[in-house]
Amino acid sequence: MSYVFVNDSSQTNVPLLQACIDGDFNYSKRLLESGFDPNIRDSRGRTGLHLAAARGNVDICQLLHKFGADLLATDYQGNTALHLCGHVDTIQFLVSNGLKIDICNHQGATPLVLAKRRGVNKDVIRLLEFLEEQEVKGFNRGTHSKLETMQTAESESAMESHSLLNPNLQQGEGVLSSFRTTWQEFVEDLGFWRVLLLIFVIALLSLGIAYYVSGVLPFVENQPELVH
C-alpha cells in the first residue's frame, strides 16, 4: 500500500521549494519575480505547487499558477498536486482551474483514495466525494447542455422523492452503497488476484469444514453399498 505524505520532508536546498514548504508568500514572490523556475522539482519530482497544496497554502498555489506553474505536473509516483491536498480551499482552487478530480497516480489511486488513507478531515472527504460524483455525471467536463442538466436534476429530484416515500428502500440503498464502496477499496488495496486467491482459499476451507462435520465430501455422490 503506497502513498505520499509530504510532511516527511521539511528541508530542501532549493530556495523556492523551501519557501513553499514554509508558507512564505513574500519570499516566494520575490524569487519568482527574479526568474526562478515555477516548475522546479525536488528529489521526488514534486514541484512547489505540490508542496504548497499539501500544506493548504492556497495563496502560494495561486502565485505559482500566475507565474506559469504547471497544474498538471506529476511527481515520480504520478501524483498531481491534488493527490497531496488535504484542505478545502486548495482543492477548490485546483479543480476550478481544470485539474481532474478522478485522475489516477501510477498505483491507480485517485486524490480521494489517498485522502482517505491519510485520514484527512471529513469536510475534505465529503468535498472530494461530491466532486467525483459530479465528474462521473459530467458536470465538471462542461459536456452537458442546459436541457440535459435540467433533465438530470429533475430525475434526481424524482428519485429523492421516491426514496423519501420509501424509507426502507432509502436505507437499503445506503447500506448497499456503503458495502460497494468498502468492497472497491478492499480490492484496490489488496489487488484483484490476491482477492481472487483469498476467495479460493476460503472456498477450500469451507469444503474442508463441511467434510469434517458431515464426513461426506461435497459434490460427491454416495455410492450404494454392495450386499453380499
Curated annotation (Swiss-Prot):
Cellular compartment(s): Membrane
Membrane topology, record value: Single-pass membrane protein
Listed GO CC annotations: membrane
Any matching Pfam family: Ank_2
Protein name according to UniProt: Ankyrin repeat domain-containing protein 46
Transmembrane recorded as keyword: yes
Organism domain of life: Eukaryota
InterPro entries listed in its UniProt record: Ankyrin_rpt, Ankyrin_rpt-contain_sf
Organism: Pongo abelii (Sumatran orangutan)
Record keyword Lipid metabolism present: no
ANK repeat ranges per the UniProt record: 11-40, 44-73, 77-103, 107-138
Chain ranges passing through the membrane: 195-215
Cited SMART domains: ANK
Key words, A-Z: ANK repeat, Membrane, Repeat, Transmembrane, Transmembrane helix
Source species taxonomy: Eukaryota, Metazoa, Chordata, Craniata, Vertebrata
Gene that encodes the chain: ANKRD46
